[in-house]
């Protein structure tokens, strides 16, 4: 009940209450998630971070990390040294985020840290509300060299460019997520028919077998 309540509160825009209840994701079988076994204390805003090293670790999907990493610069502003742990495909992208001292791939050795926080607990720690969501104008910087490489590869732009992903990441180790993944996937042919009359250029950003 608490887990479903958190989703309802977040959907209603009651973020502070919703993210408080969202911590139930670690305690309900419905999510299939287990709290990480880390000896260092969990930080949820209850003590000063000045001079401390905090490990921020990825959870759930890569899209969740891309959305919630916007809170990481706020840790830096509190005087923390930030170590971010994310899946390999996100390492390069996250290196362009302000306030990060080090980005490491999930599964690699982690340097010393004093406390930790799961990525999706950051809004709770910073008492997120609709009025204080940080960096609404952008927070990730693209590598200029890679940006130029793709500009040269794609050539002059005649129309707006839109990237498409139509299939979520399948995880063989999480059968509890299979039905959720199936519900959110879209058939590419259906998308193509819907977009035929739109004056834009579409590019596939899909990775893995569905591509």
Task: Indicate residue ranges for each PLM-predicted region.
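Alpha-helical solenoid repeat scaffolds of the TPR/TPR-like class and their adjacent stem/linker regions
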Residues: 1-211
């Amino acid at each position: 009940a608490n887990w479903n309540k958190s989703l309802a509160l977040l959907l209603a825009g009651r973020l502070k209450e919703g993210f408080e209840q969202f911590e139930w994701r670690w305690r309900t079988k419905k999510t299939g998630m287990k709290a990480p076994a880390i000896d260092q204390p969990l930080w949820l805003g209850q003590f000063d971070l000045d001079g401390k090293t905090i490990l921020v670790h990825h959870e759930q999907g890569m899209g969740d990390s891309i959305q919630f990493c916007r809170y990481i610069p706020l840790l830096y502003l509190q005087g923390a040294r930030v170590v971010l742990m994310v899946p390999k495909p996100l390492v390069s992208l996250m290196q362009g985020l302000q306030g990060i001292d080090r980005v490491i791939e999930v599964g690699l050795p982690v340097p010393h840290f004093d406390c930790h926080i799961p990525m999706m607990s950051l809004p709770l720690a910073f008492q997120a509300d609709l009025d204080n969501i940080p960096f609404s104008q952008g927070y990730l910087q693209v590598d200029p060299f890679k940006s130029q490489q793709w500009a040269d590869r794609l050539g002059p732009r005649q129309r707006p460019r839109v990237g498409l992903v139509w299939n979520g990441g399948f995880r063989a180790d999480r059968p509890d997520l299979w039905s959720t993944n199936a519900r959110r996937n879209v058939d590419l042919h259906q998308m193509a028919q819907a977009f035929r009359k739109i004056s834009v250029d579409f590019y596939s950003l899909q990775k893995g077998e569905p591509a």
